[in-house]
């Protein structure tokens, strides 16, 4: 993406009132993009932290900024990207003209980027180097919920693409709150080696605490540094969340660039 000195980038994260580390990857990606000097301004806002989405309405007061690219740092389309963010940022479609004459451009979430499969494979290789993929099962862990299955659909889509490559003995999507459950990993895998990659944007409570417990990794400390975990005669390799991958900064930049190439569809705000 070429430099856009008359444009700003707003990265929207979920944040957390419980775990301050939840926003760390989003802030880190923003810092890296800012360092590259591609935009006049790069900043973040959050649903559960400060600065809030409403605060963002008062950002970008420089008259030289004509366009604001809004990229949700979310793993999939869903309630927050289709309803909460448009409502809080007062967006009325893919493009919103402000009274200040700025144009706010609402981009697709980072998790829907076409290169997500390669990032997942990269993370899997990093966490289990020199482990033969042909003797390994790869598990992609999504949240899964009865309220909104978009995260589950997104995880399943990635799994189908990775499975089609035929690199691993098996590639499965598993979830925290719906079948197939990550807690059943021992029953649904047959290989000695099992690699687990959380399909989340940050190492929040789910990926740092909940999923390891569901897997049976109960030792304190850095779960990834302790790889492989020897459980029930298996070698279990556990990764940090995919959203902590440094190349996520490139994903966010490319989602902004993609807007001008093909405007995304935005569901009506309810």
Predicted regions and their residues:
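Active-site-proximal alpha-helix that buttresses catalytic centers in soluble enzyme cores
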Residues: 1-270
């Amino acid at each position: 993406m070429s430099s856009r000195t008359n444009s700003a980038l707003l990265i929207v994260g979920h944040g957390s009132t419980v775990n301050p580390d939840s926003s760390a990857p989003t802030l880190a990606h923003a810092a890296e993009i800012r360092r590259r000097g591609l935009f006049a301004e790069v900043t973040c806002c959050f649903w559960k932290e400060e600065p809030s989405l409403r605060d963002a309405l008062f950002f970008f007061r420089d008259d030289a900024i004509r366009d604001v690219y809004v990229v949700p740092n979310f793993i999939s389309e869903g309630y927050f990207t289709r309803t909460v963010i448009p409502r809080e940022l007062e967006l009325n479609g893919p493009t919103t003209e402000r009274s200040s004459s700025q144009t706010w451009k609402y981009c697709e979430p980072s998790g829907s980027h076409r290169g997500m499969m390669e990032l997942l494979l990269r993370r899997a290789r990093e966490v289990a180097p020199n482990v033969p993929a042909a003797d390994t099962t790869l598990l992609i862990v999504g949240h899964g919920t009865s309220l909104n299955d978009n995260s589950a659909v997104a995880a399943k889509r990635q799994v189908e693409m990775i499975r089609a490559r035929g690199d691993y003995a098996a590639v499965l999507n598993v979830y925290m709150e719906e079948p197939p459950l990550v807690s059943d990993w021992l029953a649904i895998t047959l290989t000695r080696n099992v690699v687990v990659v959380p399909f989340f944007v940050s190492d929040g409570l789910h990926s740092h605490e909940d999923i390891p417990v569901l897997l049976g990794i109960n030792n304190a400390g850095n779960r990834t540094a302790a790889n492989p975990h020897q459980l029930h005669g298996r070698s279990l390799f556990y990764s940090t969340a995919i959203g902590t991958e440094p190349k996520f900064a490139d994903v966010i930049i490319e989602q902004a660039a993609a807007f001008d190439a093909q405007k995304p569809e935005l569901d009506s705000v309810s």
